[in-house]
Amino acid sequence: MGTKCCKPVSCGMCKKTENTLMDYKGNPILLTTEFTVLTDTESEEEGMADLEKPLLERVQATLAAKCDTEVEKKLPLKSKK
């Protein structure tokens, strides 16, 4: 079904399949020159991990301190005898 649907659209516009996209004015969009290929995003992911780690540690420390405070509030006070 996919090839039957796409065939009339791509055959009518251009001979090459990379030029079959049109903008709102009817001009062809050349995918090879308009967009760049993303091949390696590993370095970006590593950079984000380095930024997220200190933030995560701060959030965990804040939550731990808050939990400790809540536990102390709920503990019964020991009376001196």
Swiss-Prot record:
**What's the source species for this entry?**
Human herpesvirus 6B (strain Z29)
InterPro entries cross-referenced by the UniProt entry: Herpes_UL11_megaloV/roseoloV (IPR020170), HSV_CEP3_betahv (IPR034705)
Tell whether Membrane is among the UniProt keywords.
Answer: yes
| Record-stated family | Belongs to the herpesviridae cytoplasmic envelopment protein 3 family.
The entry's comment on post-translational modification says: Myristoylation and palmitoylation (probably on one or more of the nearby cysteines at the N-terminus) enable membrane-binding and Golgi apparatus-specific targeting and are essential for efficient packaging. Phosphorylated. Phosphorylation does not seem to be required for recycling to the host Golgi apparatus. Packaging is selective for underphosphorylated forms.
GO biological process terms, alphabetically, are: viral budding from Golgi membrane
Which keywords does this Swiss-Prot/TrEMBL entry list? Host cell membrane, Host Golgi apparatus, Host membrane, Lipoprotein, Membrane, Myristate, Palmitate, Phosphoprotein, Virion, Virion tegument
Describe the subunit structure: Interacts with cytoplasmic envelopment protein 2; this interaction is essential for the proper localization of each protein to the assembly complex and thus for the production of infectious virus.
Q: Name one Pfam family in it.
A: U71
Keyword Transmembrane helix included in the entry's annotation? no
Location comes to: Virion tegument; Virion membrane; Host cell membrane; Host Golgi apparatus membrane
The role this protein plays is: Plays an important role in the cytoplasmic envelopment of tegument proteins and capsids during the assembly and egress processes. Also participates in viral entry at the fusion step probably by regulating the core fusion machinery.
| Main localisation | virion
Topology class, membrane: Lipid-anchor
| Residues with a covalently attached lipid (N-myristoyl glycine) | G2
This chain's protein is named Cytoplasmic envelopment protein 3
Annotated Gene Ontology cellular component terms: host cell Golgi membrane; host cell plasma membrane; membrane; viral tegument; virion membrane
Membrane-crossing residue ranges in chain numbering: none
